[in-house]
């Protein structure tokens, strides 16, 4: 069972709460109206960043079930990294983590380098969104999925050495990467989704010969993009190369 939508919408004076029922999931948005919440005890990990809504909530006042483990500044549940509370320039994700949850590192502007263990399979939505000082990432060699907006607005990243195991890259995943210069799309990726590389204004070269579908606005606004290696049978969506130097939709 889930928490009914809007259940706590009028309970703004609550400062402490215990949610120990058999819930399928508990989302941060379920508790977003509890502005005065200072401590919470749950039977399951809270999905999302509750601190975004409950400014008075301290890290040491969130207690959860035995499924949760804390490794230094990392909070992990069932091999999913769900929270990071550090302020390091170099972040080494603990071994054993398979999933980096949504928005875990969003807006962490002190981070310059990320090192992932080879256990990581999935990077969630907005996981590294707006990490504006990030310049280097060592990816897991077994990574298969990159979520929507995962690296959007990482303005200092010049190149992503994506492993050949990647099968899926979400929409807007690398949008507004102003320093990005070259892209080599892994062979297992067949679709470039909506606005994946939109407004990467310094992007000059893209190799994506295995891609068979390019969705709308995928490279829109990449004003320096000229050299593109494409599959001969690729299907190109509207405005995919709008405001670029690509002449025709199948320029090689």
State each model region's role.
Residues 4-7, 30, 102-104, 124-127, ...:
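Consensus positions within tandem repeat domains that build extended binding/scaffold surfaces
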Residues 54:
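Conserved, function-critical positions that sit in or immediately flank catalytic
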Residues 75, 79-83:
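Eukaryotic protein-protein interaction scaffolds centered on beta-propeller repeats
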């Amino acid at each position: 069972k889930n928490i009914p939508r809007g259940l706590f919408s009028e309970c703004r004076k609550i400062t402490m709460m215990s949610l120990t029922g058999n819930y399928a999931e508990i989302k941060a948005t379920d508790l977003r109206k509890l502005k005065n919440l200072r401590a919470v005890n749950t039977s399951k990990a809270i999905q999302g960043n509750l601190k975004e809504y409950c400014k008075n909530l301290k890290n040491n006042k969130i207690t959860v079930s035995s499924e949760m483990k804390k490794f230094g500044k990392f909070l992990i549940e069932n091999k999913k990294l769900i929270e990071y509370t550090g302020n390091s320039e170099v972040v080494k994700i603990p071994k054993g983590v398979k999933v980096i949850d949504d928005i875990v590192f969003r807006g962490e502007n002190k981070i310059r380098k990320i090192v992932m263990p080879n256990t990581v399979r999935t990077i969630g939505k907005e996981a590294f969104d707006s990490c504006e000082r990030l310049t280097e990432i060592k990816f897991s060699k077994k990574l298969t999925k990159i979520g929507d907006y995962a690296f959007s607005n990482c303005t200092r990243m010049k190149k992503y050495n994506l492993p050949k195991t990647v099968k899926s890259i979400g929409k807007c995943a690398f949008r507004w990467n102003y320093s990005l210069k070259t892209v080599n799309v892994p062979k297992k990726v067949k679709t470039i989704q909506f606005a994946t590389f939109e407004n990467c204004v310094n992007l000059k070269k893209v190799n994506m010969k295995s891609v068979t579908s390019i969705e709308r606005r995928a490279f829109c606004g990449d004003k320096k993009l000229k050299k593109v290696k494409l599959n001969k049978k690729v299907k190109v969506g509207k405005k995919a190369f709008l405001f670029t130097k690509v002449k025709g939709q199948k320029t090689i």
